[in-house]
Amino acid sequence: MYCLLRRLLFLLPPEWVHKLVFAVLRGATAATPVRRMLTRWLGPTDPVLASTVFGVRFPGPLGLAAGFDKDGTGLDTWAAMGFGYAEVGTVTAHPQPGNPAPRLFRLPEDRALLNRMGFNNHGAGALAIRLACHHPEVPVGVNIGKTKTTPADQAVDDYRASARLVGPLASYLVVNVSSPNTPGLRDLQAVESLRPILAAVLAETSTPVLVKIAPDLSDSDVDEVADLAVELGLAGIVATNTTVSRDGLLTPGVGQLGAGGISGPPVAERSLEVLRRLYQRVGDRLTLISVGGIETAEDAWDRITAGASLLQGYTGFIYGGGLWSKHIHDGIARRLHQGGFGSLHEAVGSNAAERGRPPS
């Protein structure tokens, strides 16, 4: 059924469809009885899926990745869609319109998306008001980025301002320095630039702070960010963002679509490589959230056993439909029981022994 609906929706402009579907989801989950029924039906109910990560209780490991609900207008929706948590944003200290349209494209042969949205959002202040007025049934993290018009030498203050506004209201914060769609943003991943930003955010809030990195970083840069995160006492790392690589794409005409980051299966291999490298580097000293190309329960299981405590998806949700998160959670629960694991935590990094144990 969803395959037919998706085929029809894919005849329409991607960003228009996103707004339409998001509005339908919000409307369908607006009534409390309906929302509760959907949460019981679609949500992760098997206790083996639950875990406590950086002091926050997650009913299931799969969350909605940042980018879908940029302004937190669906805070009451995501539990009812079966997610164990949601990450909203990216929000910036000041409202901004993002890049000119068209800025979102489908790559159907690759089951992928290309976007150059550019952090379009209503600002951290507007999100803070929504967070204060709602009490979602699942944890909600907030992804913060740099305002486009803020010079790089003022980035610290920009991130600090966002952290001040949304930090007290979020389950966790993610410092996004890895989107390819804000000029110069990825340069902030260099440790000499990243250190003062992370230190400022940590000083501003007691909420757990993570950093989101790009799949296009070199291995040595991944190591440096990991070491910095441990040194500063971050809660974890989100790996990875979208890729600017166009290698191996099957969809014709991608070169004519212009700049942007690609999400979905094309980033899966590198995302898993980065996850494994991070786990070997930091072990359980940091929480690792894996995102990028997760489509099936087997994909999710590979990430968990490689060291991810939590997972995220966006493109998989677009191509998989409303039952996607339920299928992922059900598949993870099945693998946990089959493997004799008493909890999700026991399975995290369980395949690391085949590649050498991480430091403890």
UniProtKB/Swiss-Prot annotation:
User: Which class of enzymes does this protein belong to?
Assistant: oxidoreductase
Q: Which GO terms describe its cellular component?
A: cytoplasm; plasma membrane
Active site (UniProt)? S179 (nucleophile)
Query: Which superkingdom heads the taxonomic lineage of this protein's source?
Result: Bacteria
Q: How is the cofactor bound?
A: Binds 1 FMN per subunit.
Membrane topology note: Peripheral membrane protein
> What InterPro entries does the record point to?
Aldolase_TIM, DHO_dehydrogenase, Dihydroorotate_DH_2, Dihydroorotate_DH_cat, Dihydroorotate_DH_CS
- Please list the residues that bind FMN: A66, G67, F68, D69, K70, T90, N143, N176, K212, T240, G264, G293, Y314, T315
Keywords from UniProt, A to Z, are: Cell membrane, Flavoprotein, FMN, Membrane, Oxidoreductase, Pyrimidine biosynthesis
Q: Which PROSITE patterns match?
A: DHODEHASE_1, DHODEHASE_2
Q: Per UniProt, where does substrate bind?
A: K70, N115, R116, M117, G118, F119, N176, N181, N241, T242
State the needed cofactors, names only: FMN
The keyword Magnesium is annotated on this UniProt entry: no
- UniProt-annotated location(s): Cell membrane
Which GO terms are recorded in the biological process aspect for this UniProt protein?
A: 'de novo' pyrimidine nucleobase biosynthetic process; 'de novo' UMP biosynthetic process
This protein's pathway:
Pyrimidine metabolism; UMP biosynthesis via de novo pathway; orotate from (S)-dihydroorotate (quinone route): step 1/1
Primary location class? membrane
Tell me one GO molecular function of this protein.
dihydroorotate dehydrogenase (quinone) activity
Per its record, the protein catalyses: (S)-dihydroorotate + a quinone = orotate + a quinol
Protein EC? 1.3.5.2
Show the SUPFAM superfamilies listed in the entry.
FMN-linked oxidoreductases
User: What does the UniProt function comment say about this protein?
Assistant: Catalyzes the conversion of dihydroorotate to orotate with quinone as electron acceptor.
What quaternary structure, including any partners, is listed in this protein's UniProt entry? Monomer.
Q: Which family does it belong to?
A: Belongs to the dihydroorotate dehydrogenase family. Type 2 subfamily.
Q: In its UniProt entry, what is this protein called? A: Dihydroorotate dehydrogenase (quinone)
